[in-house]
Amino acid sequence: MLPKRAYPVQDSNVHSQEKKIIAGNWKMNINHSQAVSYLQELNWRLIDNGHDFDACEIAVFPPFTDLRSVQTLVASDDIQISYGAQDVSAFSDGAHTGQISAQFLKDLDCKYVLIGHSEQRCLPCYPGNNSAINELNNKHDGLIANKLLRSFAAGICPILCIGDISPGDHFDATLSRFRSVLSHLKAISDKKHSIGYALGSKTHFLDSDQLHMLVAYEPSSAINSGNCANSGDIVRMAAAIKDIVNVRVLYGGGVNLFNASAVFNEDLLDGILVGRASLNASDFASLIKTCCL
């Protein structure tokens, strides 16, 4: 287990009190106008199904260009669906063309942000003139750690995605990468002024192994396959993650209407991250209903 550290944390009993979550990652689907009709339909279908929002949180992850439309609709119609972004910059501001800062996402009332998704990790890191970019170039775990800290600073809950980079990877390799991200996070946190300056007085620091984030386990062999990983492997991974640090764990990869309930209702899991099966509001509502019966 990693040594005690000063990280942004939640109260010690928070995880036992928090509800499970079903999240839909839209990826590069559904434009800003479609997002409005999608959320309206999903909301009334959930209400019509008698969904208990106090027992199970529903969240969606639209493309960046949809977020303002989603924010406006959720606020105006008092919709009880959470939302977040699919990625965030490792930098707070500056000359970083095409990147979106955590504070920009906070200004759009994002509750969550996905970090380290396998479809992002496979993108090449291009070198730049900025020394900070060069330092992070080809160091994905360090980059991810910086994104986590920017999210903490903005008051957004990150969902750290971990999994084998290739189907040939093993259980221990996935956990090794998770430990590597945490080690980078600790190293950055220990640098003079880096955390205090970034987070100011908004976040308290305690010696704790409980991070204010979620972890989504997404094995590459299951993503976009339509088939979940073996339930035994999922539970084993969730237990191992929670043994390293006290976080809520989601499962993602091949989740669909027919397997979602079995995965969602595993005792060690705190929810599921759904991809393709969340792109149709009616289908997603049906999936949610099967999980929450």
Swiss-Prot record:
Protein's pathway: Carbohydrate biosynthesis; gluconeogenesis; Carbohydrate degradation; glycolysis; D-glyceraldehyde 3-phosphate from glycerone phosphate: step 1/1
Task: Give the family this protein belongs to, as stated in its UniProt record.
Answer: Belongs to the triosephosphate isomerase family.
Active site, per annotation: 117, 218
Q: What is the protein's name according to its record?
A: Triosephosphate isomerase
Q: What is the lineage of its organism?
A: Bacteria, Bacillati, Actinomycetota, Actinomycetes, Micrococcales
The function of this protein is: Involved in the gluconeogenesis. Catalyzes stereospecifically the conversion of dihydroxyacetone phosphate (DHAP) to D-glyceraldehyde-3-phosphate (G3P).
Which Pfam families does this UniProt record tie to the protein?
TIM (PF00121)
Provide the GO biological process annotations. gluconeogenesis; glyceraldehyde-3-phosphate biosynthetic process; glycerol catabolic process; glycolytic process
- Please give the Gene3D superfamilies that the UniProt record associates with this protein: Aldolase class I
Going by the record, the broad EC class of this enzyme is isomerase
- Binding residues annotated for substrate, in chain numbering: 25-27
- Answer whether the UniProt record assigns the keyword Cytoplasm to this protein: yes
Q: Cross-referenced InterPro entries, in alphabetical order? A: Aldolase_TIM, TIM_sf, TrioseP_Isoase_bac/euk, Triosephosphate_isomerase, Triosephosphate_isomerase_AS
What EC number(s) does this enzyme carry?
5.3.1.1
Top-rank lineage group of the source organism = Bacteria
- Read off the PROSITE patterns from this record: TIM_1 (PS00171), TIM_2 (PS51440)
Is Chaperone tagged as a keyword? no
Q: How does it assemble?
A: Homodimer.
User: What GO CC terms are in its UniProt record?
Assistant: cytosol
Q: Where in the cell is it found?
A: Cytoplasm
What catalytic activity is recorded?
A: D-glyceraldehyde 3-phosphate = dihydroxyacetone phosphate
Query: What GO MF terms are annotated?
Result: triose-phosphate isomerase activity
Q: Which UniProt keywords apply?
A: Cytoplasm, Gluconeogenesis, Glycolysis, Isomerase
